[in-house]
Amino acid sequence: MEVTGRLFIWAILAVSCGAQLNSTEAEGKSRCTASLGGANLGETHKALVLQLSANENCTWTIERPENRSIRIIFSYIKLDPGSRCETENIKVFDGSSTSGPLLGKACSRNDFVPVFESSSNSMTFQIVTGLTKFPRSVFIFYYFFSAATVIPNCGGDLRALEGSFSSPNYPKPHPELAYCVWHIQVGKGYKIQLKFTDLLLEMDENCKFDFIAVYDGPSTTAGLLKQLCGRGKPTLESSSDAMTVVLSTDYANSYKGFSASYTSIYIHDVNTTSLSCVSDKMRVIISKSYLPALNYNESNLQLNDPTCRPNVSNVIEFSIPLHECGTVKKIEDHAISYTNRITFIESPVSAVITRQKLLQIVVTCEMEYNSTVEIMYITEDDIIQNQSVLGKYNTSLALYESDSFENLVQESPYYVDLNQTLFVQATLHTSDPSLVVFLDTCRASPTSDFASPTYDLISSGCCQDETCKVYPLFGHYGRFQFNAFKFLKHLNSVYLKCKILICDNNDQTSRCNQGCVPRRKRDIPSYKWKTDSVIGPIRLKRDRSASRDSGLLPQIHEAEISNQPLSRLYLFSFMVLALNVVIVAITTVKHFLNRWMDHRYQKLQVY
């Protein structure tokens, strides 16, 4: 009888756990731990409305015998808006328990629609609520899917300055259980304007079922611009050069979906023209309002190579590669410059006369010390307008694990042993294949500001350290190796700074082709294409075993010996202080003993 009673109690508990998935607990703590799915292979999806009370700690597990992944979507979350994410949140775990890897967390302050995917056939999510009484509600939709199943035209990368896209099957009904992501990325200096020319999805006040989520950035964790459903033709704008659009559909009520187009808007003010140079291209921006005043339009523009066309939005942009589109490279006194020409093609009404101004824009990028200088001048009927701005070389300095220079060291700081061989590579990021990198000077310092002391590894292209080895010229890469060391009387950190020279590989008299010049027989300041790169810190491991094998062992011992007199002084001072404390203590005790003797009771004399 006792066994039967226990079974009856367990049955009541099991029923109450399952009922909580679709019922509301107005007061008190609900029993909300349950297992979902797994029993019925025909059940591929499920929608739940969870009503939660205060002070809950609920856990649900989704499982399925078939080896398929799970996608769970929290399309509507109503938690206590005044709670902190640490005390009231939703956590999703990859696996059949909360001990699995955490896929992510959501709370009332999240500015995105939480969507998570498992790596296998099980997933667990946990909801914890705070002590405040508040009507909480969460809408959850999950389904099983196979990564091998692909829906055509469902998402993609859009890189042009303008374009269009639509939901799968548009204008026919969209597919069920679709999750499509479009990443829109335009050029730097632009923002994106997205227009929905047609939109028809399942209508719902909170867009819980079929919806579009538009994010202000390159991923679904960027700020949510808007969650859309129903009908309409909204227009949205990003704050940067990236935008992400998501379409999520459930298992019922499919409509025709959406059609959208986007354009790019240049965010900077351009009165007439502007020029900028980077390591691999020149970028010319021409204001659209500048051309009508001269009776031209964008179709009249061309570069030296007329097949290279501009991108047109609210401005006209030429992105000119340094070794394409008719760009002319010039070497003069070892200085490298790149020049191209934008001309306005006239459509004359007569072969004899014209009433249009003859206009051309000449753009030049010249390499300068630690930078590039951009020069632009416009000729308009013998009138020359000059413009110039400054930029920097795009170079980097990095550590690699071996002399193959394939595996980049990602750690920062990088912990090494004394005397360990380190491999360093300087990289020039440019599209010009004829440029070559030369390591002129590489210097080490225990501090990032490279104040004294410093130690030269390479000077004037020559190794100054016995463990240093400079590799031969290799295109856009300058490489060398050396053995790790430490600075005496400093922390075990080392920073590296290298001065890099960039030359034309065809210039046989350039500094790069001279190699090591010990006595500085050339004038480095006359070379304009020069830049600095810094890396660090490199730190020694706490293991001292490498120090015993290092050639720096005598120097380390010397540093320890030099500190011994100072240690003896500290010991002597401590002994004197201790002796003074003892003397003061004895004097104090003696004083109290004397006072006690003076105040003892004495026998009175009898008269």
From Swiss-Prot:
Swiss-Prot/TrEMBL GO biological process terms: cell adhesion; cell division; female pregnancy; trypsinogen activation
Membrane topology: Single-pass type I membrane protein
Localization of this protein: Zymogen granule membrane
Primary site of residence: membrane
Lineage of the organism: Eukaryota, Metazoa, Chordata, Craniata, Vertebrata
Residue intervals of the ZP domain: 276-519
SS bonds (residue pairs): C17-C58, C85-C107, C154-C180, C207-C229, C442-C498
Glycosylation positions in this chain: N22, N57, N67, N419
SMART domains attached to this UniProt entry: CUB, ZP
Keywords of the record: Cell adhesion, Cell cycle, Cell division, Cytoplasmic vesicle, Disulfide bond, Glycoprotein, Membrane, Repeat, Signal, Transmembrane, Transmembrane helix
Function: Localized to zymogen granules, where it functions in trypsinogen activation. May indirectly regulate cell motility, cell-cell and cell/extracellular matrix interactions.
Signal peptide (UniProt feature, chain positions): 1-19
Residue stretches making up the CUB domain: 20-146, 154-265
Phenotype upon loss of function: Mice display increased severity of secretagogue- and diet-induced pancreatitis which seems to be due to impaired activation of trypsin.
Transmembrane stretches, start-end: 569-589
UniProt source species: Mus musculus (Mouse)
Pfam families on file: CUB, Zona_pellucida, ZP-N
Sequence ranges on the Cytoplasmic membrane side: 590-607
Domain of life per record: Eukaryota
Expression (tissue specificity): Highly expressed in pancreatic acinar cells. Also expressed in epithelium of the uterus during late pregnancy but not detected in non-pregnant uterus or in a variety of other adult and fetal tissues.
Stretches in topological domain Lumenal: 20-568
PANTHER family, sorted: CUB AND ZONA PELLUCIDA-LIKE DOMAIN-CONTAINING PROTEIN 1, ENDOGLIN/TGF-BETA RECEPTOR TYPE III
Protein name: CUB and zona pellucida-like domain-containing protein 1
One GO cellular component term: zymogen granule
